[in-house]
Amino acid sequence: MSVTFMLALARENSFTIVEDDCLGDLAFDGRPRQTLRGLDSGDTVLYLNSFSKSLVPWLRLGYLLVPGRFEKRLILAKFNADIASPALLQEMLALYLQRGLYAVHLERLVTQYASKRVCMAQAILCSKHLSLPYPEQAGGVFFWVQIPDAVLLWKRLRLQGVKLMPETVFSLTGSAQHFLRLSYVGCPLEQILEGIHCIDWEIDWLLEPKRRWKFS
């Protein structure tokens, strides 16, 4: 479905698109990004963004660009949830942005993440059992890999100190279990290679005779 068609469909049927762009600043190709909100001329997109992925996780500050019809209700909902965001943190972040420090930080961060992404992508492509079912994106913080039983492998890998997330965590029904989400941003390059090797080793173990796994 094209973006243009999606926006037209939203306008024709009077529904709202929620665009969560928390990883939008982490683009590695240097090209300007086009958001749905930027293309929207019919006030149909509610845009969300956050600094927790690109700055520091504990800085729970973000912002909304909302269609006018939702403004009062969202302000009331936020007030009922926490009354107000911390003013000092907001002032600090505003100053950080105004002085151009965020742009400098982001450039450095993107360079680091890009090298880690290349490292993990190459390790996955060279592994015995893993593959990338989706086209690589020039940004973000993780990969999805496909396997027969993500939950079983996840349980075994936890014992080896390999931290990842099975697809069931992101499923509304908990039934999806054939993908693992691998993040590359929180560890050095050598640990990325070690982690992929460990995943391959565990899959080898599960594929041995009398084990439960079978690759079709």
Q: Which sequence ranges carry the predicted segments?
A:
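PLP-dependent class I/II
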Residues: 1-216
